[in-house]
UniProtKB/Swiss-Prot annotation:
Post-translational modification, as annotated: Produced as an inactive single-chain protein (pro-uPA or sc-uPA), is processed into the active disulfide-linked two-chain form of PLAU/uPA by a proteolytic event mediated, at least, by TMPRSS4.
GO biological process, one term: positive regulation of cell migration
Originating species: Mus musculus (Mouse)
Official protein name in the record: Urokinase-type plasminogen activator
One annotated Gene Ontology cellular component of this protein: extracellular space
Residue ranges annotated for the EGF-like domain, each copy included: 28-64
Length: 433
């Protein structure tokens, strides 16, 4: 009997007439509540079972979810996309979750369908707040939290990524020769946005290499906050652009003092991970100049808000870091390698990093575990191709060991910090999104 019923279910067909309409007593569309052009249909052998047949791009029980929407207009009251985390990366609760059913806005309201609420956890704005939101579980309570989805009006790119000083973000003078296993030494012309940050030493001795960074505008370098947490004074550091060899003069290099050092106000560290690991350095030469474009000095493009390259994409990492954790000395030449982005689901597996990973981080690794960012690479760039141009997707942050199996490098996810960057840099010329 069970086998017969299962076979019958498999053979159930939606029957339509020659004009595309459903037959066999198909119900009025109002009985299904289909939206966005969805059609209410019934099955050949189970005519009382009704559902919405959704047009392409639309999903959900009532075709109420628009999978193509990645941003919102106005205050987002009409947003029907699939964003489902708050601004800190915490997952939203489903609108039909038991705890949410006790809240004013839930999937069981009579007007739930018109408000976009249903058997899902996607962000909505049913009560006309400033932007889409959701309920988030924090401890034992549920809170209303704004969502990690951006305003469409802020996502429009400028017609050109060339600023008034002649920079063109993401442009290289040389074509790299990718060699994944172990990486390869490279000229800075392959990574002209790379910034070498040195810590000054007492007694007049030469400064020591501290961390990498990335030139995101003529006057600003992005790096990792953990590089500076022990000595957070700007006077302790000097920055070089256009440098292929550490502590050596390079033709075309420029030296800068740090005019301003900004660490993320919510930076913290635990037993393994760094959180909100991002810093900004405002740079000036001794004569008050910002960076000048050349073959060896160029800005890197910033990603669109909350947008990253697909998982599995090849990305470049660059730095003066150690080649293995056991090395005593750092290499003197700039080195570049290629790694692949690892999905959050994979990186959150217990045998990877588990709960140490959140949605403000990116993971990347060599599939053969032979290449990785290592000690000394901190603050340097993870460059991925987004919409056809090299983009600063990540900042080298932390990881367990170097090229250790199932322990990818972890990077600050730049696309989730653009509002923070812009709030400090303001209308600075040359910031290329």
């Amino acid at each position: 009997m069970k086998v017969w019923l299962a076979s019958l279910f498999l053979c159930a067909l939606v029957v339509k007439n020659s004009e595309g309409g459903s037959v066999l007593g198909a119900p009025d569309e109002s009985n299904c509540g289909c939206q966005n052009g969805g059609v209410c249909v019934s099955y050949k052998y189970f005519s009382r079972i009704r559902r919405c047949s959704c047009p392409r791009k639309f999903q959900g029980e009532h075709c109420e979810i628009d999978a193509s929407k990645t941003c919102y207009h106005g205050n987002g009251d009409s947003y029907r996309g699939k964003a489902n985390t708050d601004t800190k990366g915490r997952p939203c609760l489903a609108w039909n979750a038991p705890a949410v059913l006790q809240k004013p806005y839930n999937a069981h309201r009579p007007d739930a369908i018109s408000l976009g609420l249903g058997k899902h956890n996607y962000c909505r704005n049913p009560d006309n707040q400033k932007r889409p939101w959701c309920y988030v579980q924090i401890g034992l309570r549920q809170f209303v939290q704004e969502c990690m989805v951006h305003d469409c009006s802020l996502s429009k790119k400028p017609s050109s990524s060339v600023d008034q000083q002649g920079f063109q973000c993401g442009q290289k003078a040389l074509r790299p020769r990718f060699k994944i296993v172990g990486g390869e030494f490279t000229e800075v012309e392959n990574q002209p946005w790379f910034a070498a940050i040195y810590q000054k030493n007492k007694g007049g001795s030469p400064p020591s290499f501290k961390c990498g960074g990335s030139l995101i505008s003529p006057c600003w370098v992005a790096s990792a906050a953990h590089c500076f947490i022990q000595l957070p004074k700007k006077e302790n550091y000097v920055v070089y652009l256009g440098q292929s060899k550490e502590s050596s003069y390079n033709p075309g290099e420029m030296k800068f003092e740090v005019e301003q050092l900004i660490l993320h106000e919510y930076y913290r560290e635990d037993s393994l991970a760094y959180h909100n690991d991002i810093a900004l350095l405002k740079i000036r030469t001794s004569t008050g100049q910002c960076a000048q474009p050349s073959r060896s000095i160029q800005t890197i493009c910033l990603p669109p808000r909350f947008t990253d390259a697909p998982f599995g994409s090849d990305c470049e990492i660059t730095g003066f870091g150690k080649e293995s954790e056991s090395d005593y000395l750092y290499p003197k030449n700039l080195k570049m390698s290629v790694v692949k982005l690892v999905s959050h689901e994979q990186c959150m597996q217990p045998h990877y990093y588990g709960s140490e990973i959140n949605y403000k981080m990116l993971c990347a690794a060599d599939p053969e575990w032979k290449t990785d960012s290592c000690k000394g690479d901190s603050g340097g760039p993870l460059i991925c191709n987004i919409e056809g141009r090299p983009t600063l997707s990540g900042i080298v942050s932390w990881g367990r060991g170097c090229a250790e199996k199932n322990k990818p490098g972890v990077y600050t996810r730049v696309s989730h910090f653009l509002d923070w960057i812009q709030s400090h840099i303001g209308e600075e010329k040359g910031l290329a999104f």
